A protein has these predicted regions:
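Bacterial N-terminal signal peptides
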Residues: 11-22
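Gram-negative and organellar
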Residues: 27-425
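Bacterial N-terminal signal peptides that target proteins for export
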Residues: 2-12
Length: 425
């Protein structure tokens, strides 16, 4: 894992070099932004244990620096936010780190590249759909470093038609021994082709190499084919076939997943959007014990006068080998979630999120179910132009067939923050 730390430092240096070289080469609009946040955090069950709970209060201070640069054909973004965290339980301090860097450039009328790196050193689990990270809440508090790198190149060879080459790399490295560290490599290729104004298609392939410390290493091949038809400017229908093959380097049983679906993407009104996809997934194990699952996706978004409401429901098969928890593998699951964001007053914004998810794990010796309920609520008040005060509450209840995996956790956050532009040139 020491080599990965060197690569992270090298990646950050490359980004800074690209930023300053690009800024000097052409006329760019640059902004330096600074901020700071003060926080109090209460956690009722830091180790996500159903017995012998440990509670903790922490106090944190986190300065931040953001550097933005934009030009006619390229954009740079760099943000770094270290955090000094004091634990009232252990009377110790730690320093967290969060870094995000992006560089995209249009080299010609047809060629564009993207380079992005995200680094995080912390204890809390977190999810980020944009970079494809989901470290499960059930991990509890474990000190770790996580780095995610993405590089891609697109070539537009015709109207609404392109070829995309990509490479993604993720590294999870825990400070304590015995955790499921991993290195994940994923090169990929995607083709989007517009046949005519009504018909278009997408085909993609990705190979994933997973190198784990505690679990079996794996090789994964994943391919998808989509066919789209535009019924109208506001309505699109499509069909999809997907295939995934996983080969383990160890006693874990290899498997294939076949998925066939059809769907609808429609703007019901200027403020309402509906996405619907349904079909079936088939889980085929080399050692027998095949299973099938309903594949379903529903998303409804409604723009309110002063807010946004979203509702989603989904079911299918979920591959969780890279969740930072051992003995996860493939689960058959279903989930519902509702989110409401509302501007309550001129300077007061509220948020409420509720979700329920149920998993049946198919690769464990005895199939086990886990049921998770989550709620997340916050109020944010803006004042004095640059300042914001936020109070947030989260609750997680995990009810598992295996009693040792059951727990509930309450968290309360109080955050005072400010951010403003310091310099423009």
């Amino acid at each position: 894992m020491h080599k990965t730390k060197m690569l992270r430092c090298l990646g950050s240096g490359v980004f800074l070099g690209l930023f300053f070289a690009g800024s000097a080469a052409v006329a760019m609009e640059n902004t330096l932004r600074g901020g700071i946040s003060l926080g109090q955090d209460y956690d009722s069950n830091i180790y996500r244990d159903n017995q012998g709970r440990e509670t903790e209060w922490t106090t944190s201070i986190s300065p931040s620096m953001t550097l933005l640069s934009s030009g006619p054909r390229e954009n740079y973004f760099f943000r770094y936010a270290p955090g000094l965290v004091y634990s009232h339980r252990t009377d110790n301090e730690r320093i967290d780190h969060a870094l995000l860097a992006k560089f995209d450039k249009k080299w010609t009328e047809h060629v564009r590249t993207l380079l992005q790196d995200s680094f995080r050193r912390a204890e809390d689990p977190y999810e980020d759909a944009e970079i494809g990270v989901r470290l499960r809440d059930s991990r509890g508090r474990n000190r770790y470093s996580h780095n995610s790198l993405l590089a891609s190149m697109e070539y537009d060879y015709a109207q609404a038609s392109l070829v995309r080459l990509s490479y993604a790399n993720q590294v999870l490295d825990h400070s304590e021994a015995g955790q499921d560290d991993f290195v994940k490599h994923t090169p990929g290729l995607a083709l989007t082709h517009r046949f005519n104004p009504q018909w278009s298609g997408v085909a993609d392939y990705a190979y994933t190499k997973g190198d784990f410390d505690a679990s079996d290493d794996l090789d994964q091949h994943a391919a998808n084919a989509y066919l789209y038809y535009n019924l109208s400017p506001s309505t699109k229908i499509f069909g999809r076939y997907g295939y995934t093959e996983v080969d383990y380097d160890g006693p874990s049983v290899d498997y294939d997943i076949h998925t066939a679906t059809a769907g609808l993407d429609r703007a019901l009104s200027p403020t309402t959007a509906l996405f619907l996809e349904g079909g079936g997934s088939f889980f085929v194990r080399d050692a027998g014990g095949d299973r099938d699952s309903l594949y379903f996706r529903l998303s409804l978004k409604e723009e309110l006068q002063r807010g946004l409401f979203t509702f989603s429901a989904e079911s299918g098969l979920d591959e969780q080998q890279f969740s930072g928890v051992t003995d996860q593998g493939v689960s058959r699951y279903w989930k519902v979630k509702g989110d409401l964001r509302q501007q309550l007053l001129k300077d007061l914004q509220g948020m409420l999120s509720l979700s329920y998810r149920e998993d049946t794990y198919l690769e464990r010796v005895i199939g086990e179910d886990e049921r998770e309920f989550r709620t997340d609520a916050s109020l944010s008040y803006a004042f004095w132009q640059y300042y914001q005060a936020t109070v947030r509450y989260t609750y997680v209840n995990m009810d598992a067939d295996l009693a040792a995996n059951s727990y509930d956790d309450n968290r309360v956050f109080f955050i005072l923050s400010t951010e403003r532009d310091l310099l423009k040139w």
